[in-house]
């Protein structure tokens, strides 16, 4: 079989199929016979993932860590065969590359000689490894922007109820928050951290509004499927204030 179409979608399908094969009692036989995946290739990927776990001080779930080495071997083959993610991520790339987690994973990959030449592949591989704790991996880079805007509108409606104030120029506010929360989605969803923080002086100035915003972010947390850290709520508060 040959896969055609958007490379990210193709990889999502390969990941789904890999998961399904792993559920079979003949999984290793299928991988070895039909895809010629060698035990040494799998062991190299497992070693790399264990090093990432040590570097990040995390432990990935058993089912993901079983599937991941096989998917990573297939991913490496696609990249070597010229199937590259062509999307350009602009500010999103900078948001991810500035994180401590990205630096740690790149350090491990470079040390093992596994670092792709393409920066978009750096991002893809980094986010895939970080996402091993997440259930739905079908679209690592994608998010539903319409759904995000809907949840921003719900957040603003809740904020207006909590403050008993009608906000001005809500359309522009929604647009600004959508632009900010797109890269924030990846920081929050994958638990990414950086050395950048707001100063205590700025936080103190925002505190009166911060607590109201914090009490209104439930719709956004529903979208992210994660609790929003206080530092991210402070950044959201800056847009409101």
Residue ranges and their predicted role:
Residues 1-241:
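A cross-family "folded-core" feature that marks the main globular domain of proteins
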């Amino acid at each position: 079989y040959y896969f055609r179409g958007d490379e990210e979608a193709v990889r999502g399908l390969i990941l789904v199929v890999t998961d399904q094969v792993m559920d079979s009692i003949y999984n290793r036989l299928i991988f070895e016979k039909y895809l010629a995946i060698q035990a040494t290739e799998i062991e190299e990927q497992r070693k790399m993932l264990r090093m990432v776990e040590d570097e990040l001080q995390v432990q990935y779930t058993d089912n993901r860590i079983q599937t991941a080495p096989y998917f990573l071997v297939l991913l490496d083959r696609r990249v070597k065969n010229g199937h590259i993610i062509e999307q350009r991520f602009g500010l999103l790339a900078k948001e991810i590359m500035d994180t401590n987690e990205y630096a740690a994973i790149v350090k491990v990959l470079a040390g093992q000689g596994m670092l792709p030449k393409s920066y978009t592949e750096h991002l893809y591989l980094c986010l895939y490894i970080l996402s091993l704790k997440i259930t739905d991996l079908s679209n690592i880079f994608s998010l539903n922007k319409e759904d995000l805007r809907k949840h921003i509108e719900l957040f603003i409606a809740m904020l207006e109820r909590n403050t008993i104030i009608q906000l001005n120029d809500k359309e522009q506010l929604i647009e600004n928050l959508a632009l900010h929360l797109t890269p924030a989605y990846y920081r929050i969803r994958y638990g990414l951290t950086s050395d950048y923080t707001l100063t205590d002086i700025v936080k103190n100035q925002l505190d009166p509004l911060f607590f109201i915003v914090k009490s209104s972010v439930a719709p956004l947390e529903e979208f992210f499927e994660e609790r929003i850290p206080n530092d991210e709520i402070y950044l959201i508060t800056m847009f409101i204030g």
